[in-house]
Amino acid sequence: MMGYMKTLLLLATLIVTLTTHAKTNLEIIKIGHPTLRATAQEVIHAEISNPEFQSLIDDMISTMSEAGGVGLAAPQVNKSLRMFVMKSWPSVSLTVVINPTIEYLEDFGKKDSVEGCLSIPGKNLKVQRFKKIHLSYFDRKGEYISVELNGFGAIIAQHEYDHLNGILIVDLVEQMISKINYIGFSNAPLM
Ligand SMILES: [Zn+2]
């Protein structure tokens, strides 16, 4: 009987441990918080493999999913690091982007993009984004990746990259037209 109880207790402990470590949802900070306006710091390459950094990546992925977002940048969870995650099934697979650089391919022009921001509740704004970009970064294994992006992937990457430089979508909209711009867009993607 004691052995049975012990096994049960061990099982219960294991389940609690697994569930508490599997995902931690982080607090998403809102406009007005100074971290959103700071220029985020480069991630030291040797630290990418650190368990704490890998946990931060996992926590950001689960926080993004829980919030119904398609992208989330580290400054939005009050970590001033040059890192973001993005995912929008089926067009954008889960991507972890560390220390990115963007080359805006201006020849392909810009297009309107209606966006919501997880750090600006209730405001969907119409901004302009480049149609095509070249994104270079390190993935979560520390490997260097260099890709051309268009479509929704390019939009999310530009939004998240702005977060690393303290730029929010409210900055990209002319003050005079902002009121008009966020009326009527109810289902904009959150990022
Ligand atoms: Zn945002």
Where do the model's predicted regions map?
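Sec-dependent N-terminal signal peptides
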Residues: 8-16
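Positively charged
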Residues: 19-191
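Bacterial N-terminal signal peptides that target proteins for export
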Residues: 1-9
